[in-house]
Amino acid sequence: MFLNPKAEEVAKLLRAARTIAIVGLSPDRTRPSHGVAKALQRFGYRIIPVNPFAESILGEPAVPSLDQLPEVLASDERVDVVDVFRRREHIAGIVEACIRLQLPALWLQEGVVDESAAARAVQAGIFTVMDRCLFRERAALRD
């Protein structure tokens, strides 16, 4: 059974992170992913939209998949967290991409649950949070 990391570990991740790739980020302002991404920008994070149907979202160039992340990263920049707004059936493939790209942290947004994919990510050494809202967790931190 998958267990989320302890609150202090999550807080440490969110304080250290600088760049967040958001898989499934919508250009539609009414979608939850858009609101979360905008709030994350206000918190000072650089966001990278991962959406095959968008050129840019919230002023940032979009990439069609996680495999294209290197195309938009500076030479000294890395993705610290992959935040996912996709349905369960897409999660296993996203986890495999995170493993292949050696991305350090995976965040499955509230309502996104895939126990076996989350366990696979943890087994591969990826810090994994599931079924929690990254925005709410970050907003609750005292800087």
Question: Each predicted region: which residue ranges?
Answer:
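NAD(P)-binding Rossmann-fold cofactor-contacting core
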Residues: S26-R31, K38-L58
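Conserved beta-strand elements of the Class I
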Residues: I20-A21
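Glycine-rich, highly charged phosphate/nucleotide-binding loops
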Residues: M1-K6, I57-E77, D83-A92
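Rossmann-fold NAD(P) dinucleotide-binding segment
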Residues: H90-L106
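Rossmann-fold NAD(P)-binding glycine/threonine-rich loop
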Residues: E110-R138
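Short internal beta-strands
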Residues: I48-N51, L106-E110
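N-terminal Rossmann-like NAD(P) cofactor-binding module of classical short-chain dehydrogenase/reductase
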Residues: V82-D83, W107
